Amino acid sequence: MAGLAATLGSGAMTNSISDIRQAEVLLVTGSNTTEAHPVISLEMKAAIRRHGAKLILIDPREIELAEFAALHLRPRTGTDVAVLNAMAHVLIGENLIRQDFIDARTEGFAGLSEAVRDCTPEWAEAISGVPADLITGAARLYGGAAHAAIFWAMGITQSSHGVDNVQALANLALLTGNFGRPGTGVNPLRGQNNVQGACDMGGLPNVLTGYQPVTDDAARAKFEAAWQTAFPIPAKPGLTVTDLMNGALEGHIKALYITGENPLLSDPNLHHIQSAFEKLEFVVVQDIFLNETAQIADVVLPGVSFAEKEGTYTNTERRVQRVRHAIPALDGARLDLDIICDLGRRLAAPESTSAVPDPVHPVCNWDYSGPAAVWDEIAALTPSMSGISYARLEIGGIQWPCTSADHPGTPILHREKFTRGLGRFMPLVYRGPMETPDEDFPFMLNTGRMLQHWHGGTMSRRSAGLDALVPEGHIEINILDAQDMGIYPGDMIRVTSRRGTVVGPARPTDRLPRGMVFMTFHFAESPANVLTGDAVDPVAKIPEYKASAVRIERV
């Protein structure tokens, strides 16, 4: 999000799922789309099979989508910017750019041209391992299409240079004018069903709803008036998850309230996270299962599942949709909204008669009649969603921005201008991953997901059908590396990084390049995040889950 926000002014899919089939070229990177976003992968395959689209896949692994690729570039982990800068070099050098679009709708072109002047495909090959002719071919294929769309997911954002990766992709789209039309754009595929909605609602440390910055005096004043706060909303952005954990370890953070998250399995460098939790004085977990984090909490608040909730989700294409409960809440469980409002009322302490404004006891009224009342407040305070109402959502989903009651929603962003006015080229200098293989740790660990499970497995591993399909985690290793080490399928192997050790069954495969190891992070029995580091992107603060130097040993 941070990368696109700086480049375009908003951090979301520019286009809709429905217009994927109108693309002539699809560039997919950092996304195992078949397993992480299966519906979207079907649209991509339909574009290829039925409409003749060409797929450029950039992924070190031979994922299922590789079978459909016209070109498959397999860079070394963490070398994406080198490849993408080289593609920009080819686009400019061979005049595969739309100069009219650049002149009318962008800024910073001269700076980008200078930044990539020496980024030849041969230079990128030396860094990434991708043959120069493949990089040139990818640039020509992308630049030669009238409608080319870019898609990515956490394979390139969970990196110490994730923002650079995203901005390098946006540079390609800006160079070729691939915005504002069907089958074009830059399209981050969000990690789960309501990640987009959570961010839209201000679930980030630096914004209020609709990405209104907390540093904006007018935005804060508007919310203070609506909420009748007795104390100003802080103008300073809050802490990210990684900052919170460091703060706990240093003693600055004393308590955590965690909902819908399992940091003791899904956060990086788990020994570091465990040490941080040991320093906390008070932990509250609001969830539907007693996951690893809930098991050590001081207080557990039983929430409800999606099937028991009312409200809205916003999916990856910015579509706000109604969610209706299928069953009543189970005994002992409560709606998240009710829990939060009850807590708010307790903190508001209406019995207090102090005339001095108290930052812990605001005057805010927590008497919402239900989810619809909350949405009414969202619409009243959020310009990009002011035209969306429950009455309209009963008919169907609406894509923001939707700024009036008769506005149809916005399937395609940036048709005439970018949210920030002009699209901004970002001159980027290649930076490698924080860790690279060496004599002591000669392999590179990559982590990700599989189709059958999700994140820490809090829900999917409690599904008997899904758990029967994949009951345990495996450690994937290149088949030739396995042969060299005398490792056979099912052998127990030990993976060690600078942070810890995990033992699990080996799965030799020809889908990984030599020198790479792959693990999912769904399984508490073999927690991959014991191995991952806590290096973060300096802007987005997202951890580097995809590049950890490790060694392998037979047990």
Predicted regions and their residues:
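Flexible glycine/proline-rich, aromatic-decorated loop/lid segments
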Residues: E64, F289-R324
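Long, well-ordered, tryptophan-enriched scaffold segments
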Residues: R49-I56, R61-A145
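Anionic-ligand anchoring segments at beta-strand to alpha-helix junctions in alpha/beta enzyme folds, i.e.
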Residues: M1-R21, V186-N187
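A short helix->loop->beta-strand "cap" motif at the edges of active sites that frequently abuts
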Residues: A47-K54, E278-F282
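A glycine-rich, hydrophobic/aromatic-adjacent loop/helix-cap motif
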Residues: Y142-N246, D406, E416-L422
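Long, low-complexity segments enriched in small/aliphatic residues
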Residues: A198-C199, L204, W366-G465
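Glycine/threonine-rich phosphate-binding loop and adjacent beta-strand/alpha-helix elements that clamp
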Residues: I17, E308-A329, I340, G344, ...
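Long, contiguous, secondary-structure-rich segments that constitute the structural scaffold
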Residues: P234, L330-I398, D440, G456, ...
